[in-house]
Amino acid sequence: MKHKAGLTLLFLLCWLSLFPKAPFVDADFRLPMRIPPVLSANFGELRSDHFHSGLDFKTQGVIGKSIYSVADGHVSRISVRKYGYGKALYIDHPNGYTSVYAHLEYLSPRLDSVLRAAQYEEKSYEVNLFFDTDELPVKQGEWIAMSGNTGGSGGPHLHFEIRDTQSEDVMDPLLWYAPYIKDLAKPRIQALAVYQFAPEAHQSAPGDCLSPRTKKSIVNIADNQLQGTLPKVWGNIALGLKAYDYMSDTHNIYGVQLIRLFLDDKEIFRQDLSRFSFDNTRYINYITDYEEWALHRSWIMRSYFPHNGQGIVNISEEKDYHFRYELSDRHGNTQVFRFTLRGEKPMPTDNSLGYPQVDVSHDIQQKSIKRLLQKLL
């Protein structure tokens, strides 16, 4: 048995690596429980300072549901913490993936005896244990634990992950488990945000949209219809949206897996939450409108990348610009939302678009990003 201080996190500074294309390898994964699978949270949901890294399976409101290994493999790690994942079990599989089971109440007798021996040896409830390939083998369908509510859990459930064993990136378990879960519901958009950037914001660094002189308009959406009037636009603009996904036979709300934005039928932005590294999960404050979250606890996902200008549109003609959002979940349910922005050159004044001189979003977000980059560099 090997004792290690913690997991080694990948250092991926390149922004494009935040949402890499997930190489899909077919695997014979079974469900971790033998009760009807219902989710309370899905992969990639927006959380405070991070993306949700797995699926939260409901356990019918109680602790003590049997948990089974989803495939053959070996226990590679047992972790016990007062917070976070609580009591968690990690199983490496020959197919190159690791399954993770968190917030457990207790382990099977065979695994629990190993855990207790280590806790007595270290004289500590909190332990982080690592094992070699031949120490604790398990078979697919073998009972390994009981569900619980340990650690930072807000109620009884099983937090379940699939990781790339080599890189430790987390991957959306619904890539394998979507056929097991009923979902006939489309994502829904609740609001559309339009950002208009002052011309000087791009003179020195095109794509740098964190200017303090940015005008933002937010229009609510209900039943896929705008509930207000969109602004006239000119110059460099970008968009954002507030949206959630839904599933059949449950009242929970979930994160949207795939967001695509089109201008005149040409895709100008794509966000696919299929896989990410734990280092890059902190970029959530970079792709969301932090002002809306800090002041109103509202998640607006920005449909542009400030570092390279992807998703930014230059409005330079007085005409209609036709946009289309396509939001999809892992089951293929797709919501299409079409809207038009009118390009209209403003009257020449000192502050023609009414850009605010101070933007809370810029101040908060700029400081947040600077702190993040200082940690990474």
Regions found by a protein language model. Give the residues of each.
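Positively charged n-region of N-terminal signal peptides that target proteins for export
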Residues: M1-A5
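Hydrophobic h-region of N-terminal signal peptides that target proteins for export
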Residues: F11-K21
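Compositionally biased low-complexity segments at domain edges in trafficked proteins
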Residues: I189-L210, D350-L377
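Short beta-strand elements
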Residues: N333-N351, P356
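Exoplasmic/lumenal beta-rich domain surfaces
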Residues: T98-T133, P212, S217-L226, G255-E317
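Short acidic/polar inter-strand loop motif in beta-rich domains
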Residues: S248, S328-V336
